[in-house]
Each structure stands twice: as structure tokens, then as C-alpha cells.
Amino acid sequence: MDSTLAVVDAQPDIEALYRADADRLWRAVYAFAGDPEIASDAVAEAYAQVLRRGSAVRDPAAWVWRTAFQISRGALKARSLDATMSAPSVDHADTYADHDLLTAVHQLPEGQRAAVILFYYADLPIRQIADLLGTNSIAVRANLSRGRRHLRDRLGDHDG
């Protein structure tokens, strides 16, 4: 089968995946990167790449998520953003209930930020997060624990 036929065969499945999951993926990448342009570019490029690869991709949903986060990480590095990147603009921050929390999440180290966003914002299970990040469940749990501790230290304990 030539590559054109592979793309045509995969297209309906990828279109269905896009309709079902692209908005949630965009929100997760945006929460990670803090930049709506990076999020839009990363999601669009990830779906374009999975379409080009066609049936060669074993798990398109996981592949798209992993690729979108890799693209966003590359874009952040290219822009030389550091851990103290600014909070999202107010018009985009309105989609999140707690602007201070999102600002604090953006200041977490990359591994902790990715784990926290994928677990709490994208509502993904730990095993899937590990697969997306190319790590194991123990590392994800450790990053979640450290991330929560940093957030608690920064924001205080609001439970009591």
C-alpha cells in the first residue's frame, strides 16, 4: 500500500479522534505551555503528523497527545522561556476557575507541570500519563506528589 492510501484509510479514524479529543488536548497543552499559539500549533501539527503516518501509528490517540506535548516543549525551548514564564492573558485564563493556581502550576518544573496538568486538567489516569510522557507510573506519582507539595507551599492549604 502506498503512503497516500495509508493516509486515506486512516483519515476517518483520525477525524473522529480529532472531533472527540482535540479540544481537551488543546486545553491540556495550553495549560502546560501557557501560550494559546503554541497550543494551537502543537495540536494541529500532531494531528497532521498522525495523518501523514497513517496506519503506521499503533495507538493514534496516545501518539497525538505525546507528540503535541513534545512539540510544545520544543516550542517553549525555542522561545527560551524559563520556569518563571508569565501567566496566560486574562481572556484565556477565564476558562480556569483559579488564576492563581494556574500561575503557580506554570512555575512548576516541567515534569511536575506535565504530570499535574495531565492528571488534574486533562483528567487522565496515571498509567496513560506515564505512556504519554515516556516514563513509568512511579515517576508520574513522584512528580504529582512533588508538584502538589510545591503548590501547597506556594498557595497555602485552602482545605481548612
Residues covered by each model-derived region:
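C-terminal edge and immediately downstream basic/flexible tail or linker adjoining helix-turn-helix-like DNA-binding
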Residues: 2-6, 13, 132, 149-160
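A short, charge-rich alpha-helical start-of-domain segment used by transcription regulators
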Residues: 2-27, 37, 55, 113
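Short, small-hydrophobic-rich alpha-helical interface motif
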Residues: 25, 29, 39-50, 67-68, ...
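Helix-turn-helix DNA-binding module
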Residues: 106, 110, 122-139
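DNA-recognition helix of helix-turn-helix
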Residues: 59, 69, 133-156
